[in-house]
């Protein structure tokens, strides 16, 4: 007597339809199961800001996980997050009741590193992976602040770089000609750069830094620190840099009168590009016709 009575019936079935067909059916079944699991997951939003430190000095990388689409930014607790830096696994931690998590890291060398933060695949939350920047700078190197609006075509700043080129959503703002090349020359050997968004970042919510960073990368601007001003605005951001010991912040490049006025109040030199109409340029500010003229003014 056959020990497995169903086997004689199964073998002709496999022979009739072929092993390839059977494999396709199994793959389709697995795909349906996977999609069902994904549909059951809570959509989340990861937010993480750029980090700045010195070589051989510890830095804390803070992140937050909230429910996507929630107007109250409902925190998601108990979710395992994974941190990678330059592709290397560094640490894993679970979000607290506020949806927050902090990682401590000790960089050894000067440079710019890519921070990668992701939700564990087995978690009940599904969130897009986030990349941010770890800037490891030396204090003696001068810092130049660059207003985001000075990098965008006139008239495009109001639309904001809400999406990187090629992505779904509103068209991304186009960069000013020569801005990326000229800024790369400034930062190649001398300056480090801090990008400062203006009012356009308010409409992006918690995802502002990520959106702006994607836009900068997609248009080949040099890597730098993206400083999204908080409740105190740009003035409080500048005070924060100085309190942390970054006193080599000497100059800035911008487009608006408000940006120029703020930097002058903090005793920084500022170049406005393109030059504002006569009578609108602050007395101690310098005007540049275009980005190719900026280096001559610094």
PLM region descriptions:
Residues 204-298:
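C-terminal cap/substrate-recognition subdomain and adjoining C-terminal extension
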Residues 139-231:
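Conserved, compact domain cores that house catalytic/ligand-binding motifs in diverse enzymes
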Residues 125-135:
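Edge beta-strands of extracellular beta-sandwich domains
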Residues 37-60, 134-138:
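Beta-strand-rich domain onsets/edges
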Residues 110-123:
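Short, aromatic- and glycine-rich surface loops/edge beta-strands on solvent-exposed regions
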Residues 44, 54-73, 79-81:
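Beta-strand-rich structural segments
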Residues 94-107:
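Glycine-centered loop-to-beta-strand initiation motif
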Residues 80-91:
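Short amphipathic beta-strand segments in non-cytosolic proteins
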């Amino acid at each position: 007597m056959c020990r497995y009575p169903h086997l004689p019936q199964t073998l002709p079935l496999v022979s009739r339809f072929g092993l390839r067909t059977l494999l396709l059916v199994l793959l389709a079944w697995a795909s349906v199961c996977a999609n069902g699991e994904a549909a059951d997951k809570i959509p989340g939003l990861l937010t993480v800001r750029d980090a700045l430190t010195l070589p051989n000095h510890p830095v804390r990388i803070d992140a937050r996980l909230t429910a996507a689409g929630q107007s109250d930014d409902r925190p998601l607790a108990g979710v395992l997050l994974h941190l990678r830096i330059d592709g290397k696994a560094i640490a894993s931690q679970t979000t607290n009741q506020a949806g927050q998590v902090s990682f401590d890291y000790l960089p050894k060398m000067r440079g710019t590193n890519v921070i990668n933060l992701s939700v564990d695949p087995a978690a009940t939350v599904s969130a897009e992976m986030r990349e941010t920047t770890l800037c490891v700078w030396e204090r003696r190197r001068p810092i130049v602040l660059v207003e985001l609006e000075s990098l965008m075509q006139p008239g495009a700043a109001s639309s904001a770089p809400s999406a990187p080129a090629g992505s779904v959503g509103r068209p991304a703002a186009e960069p000013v000609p020569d801005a990326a090349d000229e800024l790369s020359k400034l930062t190649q050997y001398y300056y480090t750069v801090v990008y400062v968004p203006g009012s356009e970042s308010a409409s992006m919510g918690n995802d502002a830094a990520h959106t702006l960073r994607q836009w900068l990368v997609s248009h080949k601007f040099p890597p730098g620190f993206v400083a999204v001003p908080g409740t105190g605005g740009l003035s409080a951001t500048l005070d924060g840099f100085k309190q942390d010991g970054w006193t080599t912040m000497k100059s800035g490049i911008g487009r608006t009168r408000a940006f120029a006025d703020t930097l002058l109040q903090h005793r920084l030199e500022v170049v406005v590009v393109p030059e504002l109409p006569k009578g609108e340029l602050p007395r101690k500010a310098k005007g540049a016709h275009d980005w190719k003229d900026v280096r001559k003014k610094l």
